[in-house]
């Protein structure tokens, strides 16, 4: 029984000298400090991983007292002694203790499973290493890895609700459809001399970590969070063969309340359905917003065959959601008050807001275009007072100085509407000319209300009356010419006779 213990002790002695050798990475900067404070705080190192040594955790005592319920804190105080024989004896005793406790499994307990943190603020969580007993040799055989994993957002852009239920969000091709990769934030070790070591960090001072050596607790801060920090942290304990023993997930939920909510209810023509859109701008994450509709205070339900929702992501601003709804016939009732109620929810946090709009209803005007007495005349009935007339000849707008528009009276069927008459001289240019009377001022397409007719001034269109007129004029001219000639001949003959006499 003595021989195995001696061999084991000699093995630990060899390991000890190996750690202290100048060629070893850990021992290169190792200094034995028996007065190490129980609280350590550090930022993960930003040194290069390639061939560079690990960084020793600086001794920075915390100014705040940390109270925990860690079991048997005072029972596991490590006493370091000098001299080779004392070190061998200490490790031999520890080895024996480990052999008696191999059936006990270590554990990691964290104070939360989800960290809800608002944009540009700091998120925190604390994890405690439960090892009984947490001896130096066991600590040196454990590695704590802190790994960030993003939550990707790929989704059906037309149905946010279904995507939210399925846990999938995003519009393929958006700048957040492909987030940052999973990466190791920090790898923490403790050697038999009680010194903690950390691996390089990919983000400098983005992450802040502190350790309570007495209670075996680790705190993590994620500073100035942005959308790319939305994901989950893995706290993994590995053995000396790099095999994972425990894997804890702490979700980092980045939050942003909606910046604004607006309802757009475009104007409609009498007889058409009302339509409205609710725009929820700059919130996070996608799927955290719930939209409901009210019509005059009553619940209105969107129809799946014609209504829906879609959203997009703007870098640095968050997600924007648009929800649409179609309501009843505008020719039956007065314009309703359409309200959009928005609830943003993350964890136990709820924020609500609403917006309202009343659409405007326009009635179809009546137009007629005719030609009379050398004018193109447009008769308009039942238009609002802000509506004006524009004439076009061959689809080219004419200056308003070339035509005249007057109010002829009030509309008898629609309140606050009036009747108009507008006319423009036709071109008597022996060609076929297109005239268009267009109403300006409606919030629809410019050519929504207009009437067009052709004025045909060609000879063929003028017909028999014109031919008769021309013939009569020519005949009269011939008769007059002949009369003049005969009169001249008579005068000539009379004058000649008088001369002979």
Swiss-Prot record:
It comes from Gallid herpesvirus 2 (strain Chicken/Md5/ATCC VR-987). Residues 1-27 form the signal peptide. It is found in: Secreted; Host cell membrane. The keyword RNA-binding does not apply. Its main location: secreted. Residues 53-86 are annotated as: Disordered. Belongs to the herpesviridae glycoprotein C family. This is Envelope glycoprotein C homolog. Residues 28-465 are virion surface. InterPro entries: GA_GC, Ig-like_dom, Ig-like_dom_sf, Marek_A. May play an immunoevasive role in the pathogenesis of Marek's disease. It is a candidate for causing the early-stage immunosuppression that occurs after MDHV infection. Keywords: Glycoprotein, Host cell membrane, Host membrane, Host-virus interaction, Immunoglobulin domain, Membrane, Secreted, Signal, Transmembrane, Transmembrane helix. Residues 493-501 are cytoplasmic. Residues 258-356 form the Ig-like domain. Residues 62-72 have a biased composition (Low complexity). GO terms for cellular component: extracellular region; host cell plasma membrane; membrane. Coiled coil: none annotated. Glycans are attached at residues 46, 91, 100, 120, 212, 354, 400, 429. It comes from the Viruses. The chain crosses the membrane at residues 466-492. It is a single-pass membrane protein.
């Amino acid at each position: 029984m003595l021989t195995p213990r001696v061999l084991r002790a000699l093995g630990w002695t060899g390991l000890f000298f190996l750690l202290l050798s100048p060629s070893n990475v850990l021992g290169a900067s190792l200094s034995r400090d028996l007065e190490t404070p129980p609280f350590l705080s550090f930022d993960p190192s930003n040194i290069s991983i390639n061939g560079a040594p690990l960084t020793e955790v600086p001794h920075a005592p915390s100014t705040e007292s940390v109270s925990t319920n860690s079991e048997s804190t005072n029972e596991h105080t490590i006493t370091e002694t000098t001299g080779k024989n004392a070190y061998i004896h200490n490790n031999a005793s520890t080895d024996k203790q480990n052999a008696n406790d191999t059936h006990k499994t270590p554990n990691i307990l964290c104070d939360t499973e989800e960290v809800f943190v608002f944009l540009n603020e700091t998120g925190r969580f604390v994890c405690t290493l439960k090892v009984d007993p947490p001896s130096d040799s066991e600590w040196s055989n454990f590695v704590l890895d802190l790994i960030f994993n993003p939550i990707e957002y790929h989704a059906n852009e037309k149905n946010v609700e279904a995507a939210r239920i399925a846990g999938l969000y995003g519009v393929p091709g958006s700048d957040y459809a492909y987030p940052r990769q999973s990466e190791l934030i920090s790898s923490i070790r403790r050697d038999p001399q009680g010194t903690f070591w950390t691996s390089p960090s990919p983000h400098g001072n983005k992450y802040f970590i502190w350790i309570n050596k007495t209670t075996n607790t680790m705190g993590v801060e994620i500073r100035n969070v942005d959308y790319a920090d939305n994901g989950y942290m893995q706290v993994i304990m590995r053995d000396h063969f790099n095999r994972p023993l425990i894997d804890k997930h702490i979700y980092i939920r980045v939050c942003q309340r909606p910046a604004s909510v607006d309802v757009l209810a475009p104007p409609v023509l009498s007889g058409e359905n009302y339509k409205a859109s609710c725009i929820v701008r700059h919130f996070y994450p996608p799927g955290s917003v719930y939209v409901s509709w009210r019509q005059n205070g009553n619940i209105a339900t969107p129809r799946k065959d014609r209504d829906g929702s879609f959203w997009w992501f703007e870098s640095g601003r968050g997600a924007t959601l648009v929800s649409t709804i179609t309501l009843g016939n505008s020719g039956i009732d007065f314009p309703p008050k359409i309200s959009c109620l928005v609830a943003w929810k993350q964890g136990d946090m709820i924020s609500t807001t609403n917006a309202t709009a009343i659409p405007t209803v326009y009635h179809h005007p009546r137009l007629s275009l005719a030609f009379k007495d050398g004018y193109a005349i447009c008769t308009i009935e039942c238009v609002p007072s802000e509506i004006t007339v524009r004439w076009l000849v061959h689809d080219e707008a004419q200056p308003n100085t070339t035509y005249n528009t007057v109010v002829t009276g009030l509309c008898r069927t629609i309140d606050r509407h009036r009747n108009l008459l507008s006319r423009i001289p036709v071109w008597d240019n022996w060609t076929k000319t297109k005239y268009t009377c267009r109403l300006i001022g409606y919030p629809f397409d410019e050519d929504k209300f207009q009437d067009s007719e052709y004025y045909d001034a060609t000879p063929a269109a003028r017909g028999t009356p014109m031919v008769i007129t021309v013939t009569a004029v020519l005949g009269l001219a011939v008769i007059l010419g002949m009369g003049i000639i005969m009169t001249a001949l008579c005068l000539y003959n009379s004058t000649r006779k008088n001369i002979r006499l």
